[in-house]
Each structure stands twice: as structure tokens, then as C-alpha cells.
Amino acid sequence: MTLLEMKKKVLRLIEEINDKSSLLTDDPDIANKINDVINQIQNEIARIKKIPAKEELEVAKGDEIDFSDIAKDLFQINIVRGVENDIIGNTINFYGDGTAKIYYYKYPKQITADTKDSEFTFDLSTDVLEIMPYGVAGDLLKSDISASYGQVYSNRYEQMLQRLDPRFHTGSIYLEGDDTSEFL
């Protein structure tokens, strides 16, 4: 999904869309803050439904690598394979030579006022992108005192977040051998 598509979803939801306007809305307050709000909501959701990534690094025994040296968008290490290691704080200590496969979670690409709506695509999964418009709508309308729509959208967003499955897959097990009936 592009940023343009997300904005249209949100603005249709809150009934503020104007397809003829280059800003997509006639409300200057919404136009001024929608990118910031979308960015804030995507960062919030990415801490729940994390975005997986992988880097491979050639390492030597005794190397100590800071998380920030692996990837600038690194949020959290998942697992490191290929070379014996320990993770202490924000540093990976390696106890051998070889190729380290570093599986981690990353922050999403950031949205600014200069982000091109039709060129930006989200890193987030489809289930997350279906929840986001409610969080954005709730934040955009939270200061609208004439109606409680902001609270309605915020409540719906919170309900949907609680049902969000943070997993990308479930584990599986494979049994092999002559007599596996004792395991069944």
C-alpha cells in the first residue's frame, strides 16, 4: 500500500476527503499533520507486529559489533546464527570466525512532510495496514470537541490492536525414525 492509498482510506473514514484537492482534504489542520500521525501510528504498530530483516556479516573471533553498526533501522535483535556469540546490551560478541546471519526486527521507513505520497510504500503487513486507518483517524480527531468521533476511532483501533497476531509463523516439528507412534 502506498502513502497516498493510506491517506485516502483515512480521509474517507473520517469523511474529510476531497479528491479534487492536491492535499486530498479541505481541512488545513488535517493536511498539516496527517503525515506525522501516520508515521507515529506505523512506528507504534511496528513495535507489536515487528518487521523482520536479515543481514550477513563476515566476523572474526573477538569482534564486538554494536547494533547500530549492523543496520541503521535495527529495532531489536531476534537471533544470530552461524558463529558462536553472546548478546550483551546493544553489542554482539563473536567467539569464532565466519559468516554471522543476523535476524532482526527493523523500524519502518519513516514518513516526513517531504515524503512523496505515490512513491512511498509501507513495510508493514496487510493485517497491520487494515488497522492503521483507525489509529490515524483517532489521533487526527482527538482534539475535535464538537463530536466524539476521535474517541470512537481510538476505541476501535485499540480493540483491533488487541486482536492483532504478532507472529509471522507458528513453529512446527518434524519427527523422523522407525517408530514415531509413541509421540502421537
Report each predicted region and the residues it spans.
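Glycine-enriched, solvent-exposed interface loops adjoining structured elements
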Residues: M1-L184
